[in-house]
């Protein structure tokens, strides 16, 4: 999962 979008 990415930490930021």
Swiss-Prot record:
GO terms for cellular component: extracellular region. This is FMRFamide-like neuropeptide. Belongs to the FARP (FMRFamide related peptide) family. The keyword Secreted applies. Keywords: Amidation, Neuropeptide, Secreted. May function as a neurotransmitter or modulator. It is found in: Secreted. The keyword Protein transport does not apply. GO terms for biological process: neuropeptide signaling pathway. The modification Phenylalanine amide is found at residue 5. It comes from Gallus gallus (Chicken).
């Amino acid at each position: 999962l990415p930490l930021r979008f």
